[in-house]
A protein has these predicted regions:
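Conserved alpha/beta-hydrolase catalytic His-Asp/Glu region
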Residues: 28, 34-35, 174-175, 193-253
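Conserved HGGG/HGGXW glycine-rich cap/lid loop of the alpha/beta-hydrolase fold
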Residues: 59-104
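Alpha/beta-hydrolase fold catalytic core
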Residues: 1-66, 91-92, 132, 313-314
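Acidic catalytic loop of the alpha/beta-hydrolase fold
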Residues: 265-269
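Short beta-strand/loop motif that positions the catalytic acidic residue
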Residues: 254, 260-262
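Active-site loop/oxyanion-hole signature of alpha/beta-hydrolase fold enzymes
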Residues: 49-50, 57-59, 99-141
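Catalytic active-site module of serine/aspartate enzymes centered on a nucleophile-bearing elbow/loop
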Residues: 284-314
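Flexible "cap/lid" loop of the alpha/beta hydrolase fold
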Residues: 151, 160-188
């Protein structure tokens, strides 16, 4: 009987230790109003669409016949393109948006985070803004949304830019710590309520090529925006609904001139996938960036912009 008593005490101590760890990592949701002052200054605006208040930035000349639309990746936000938008908006109309489930837009009322739901969202956004044809840019998840939109509605996409894009299986080399937690179904009740800032910092360092580029402000942004009400649950739903690489056969149907950009130190999706895109897309140019990771447009806006400007000028 002594061993049963000892086992009971061990279980109690382990339970107490786990409870203390959960308590230490517990983070309440942030209400939208708590986040606006810091993360939605001008030129941010909100557009009512599909039952959501969609956070977006629409800058530059309104007579631009082919605006540039920027789509971010999973657990990110339009802020990932701030450097690009600021630099390009004097000459081009630039539209960046927080996709459903992320950033200040928050969760989809339907809870549908499949790629086809996102492509329909992008097309409805363009319709609402009265935009007929665009240069469509996407990073990671945003890249797959971009190329699938180009396949679904080729008349709406003049040119395509894919940055470390999802598309091929196996899609993921390594997964940031925050995504690993999100993929653990048995931990959902707990993980919807915890988000250690340290985990966010570790996750960001794993997707940047240079750790020194991961500033305290960037960690704050990813940390606070992922605490927006509903975003943690939306991330878990997206992970459940994701079918990485399931539609890769469709990539051959992309006919638009395409620029593929890839960070050579991307540890999340293999840089080899950049070559795969250009094997399957007939009018394709691949540019890689030494020293950059999974978010090259955010990590070094100036260097990646040079490649983008050259592509747009052709």
């Amino acid at each position: 009987m002594k061993w049963l008593k000892r086992l009971w005490w061990i279980g109690l101590l382990v339970g107490m230790a786990v409870s203390m760890l959960v308590w230490a990592a517990w983070e309440p949701d942030r209400q939208l109003g708590q986040l606006l002052a810091r993360w939605a200054p001008e030129p941010s605006s909100f557009l009512e669409l599909d039952g959501m208040q969609v956070h977006m930035r629409d800058t530059g000349p309104r007579d631009d016949p082919t605006p540039i639309v920027l789509l971010h990746g999973m657990a990110s936000s339009l802020h990932s393109y701030e450097g690009w938008q600021t630099s390009l908006q004097d000459q081009r109309r630039i539209i960046s948006v927080d996709l459903p489930g992320f950033g200040l837009t928050g969760p989809s009322p339907q809870g549908d985070y499949r790629i086809d739901a996102y492509t329909r969202f992008v097309l409805r956004l363009l319709d609402t803004l009265g935009v007929k044809r665009v240069v469509l840019v996407g990073n990671a998840l945003g890249g797959e949304i971009a190329w699938q939109t180009a396949v679904l509605a080729p008349e709406r996409v003049r040119k395509l830019v894919l940055i470390d894009s999802d598309g091929y299986p196996p899609a993921v080399l390594s997964m940031p710590a925050a995504f690993q937690v999100a993929s653990m179904r048995g931990m959902r009740w707990v993980s919807e309520r915890i988000l250690p800032r340290a985990m966010v910092a570790i996750s960001l360092r794993s997707v940047f090529g240079n750790d020194e580029k991961v500033t305290a402000e960037k960690v704050d942004r990813y940390f606070e925006l992922n605490l927006r009400v509903g975003n943690r649950r939306a991330l878990f739903q997206r992970m459940d609904q994701a079918q990485f690489g399931a539609s890769s056969a469709l990539i051959r149907r992309v006919q638009q001139p395409t620029l593929v950009m890839w960070g050579e130190r991307d540890e999340m999706i293999s840089p080899d996938h950049g070559s795969l895109f250009c094997q399957d897309i007939p009018h394709c140019q691949l540019v890689t960036f030494a020293g950059l990771g999974h978010l090259p447009q955010e990590e070094d806006a100036e260097r990646t912009l040079r490649a983008l400007r050259d592509f747009l000028a052709k």
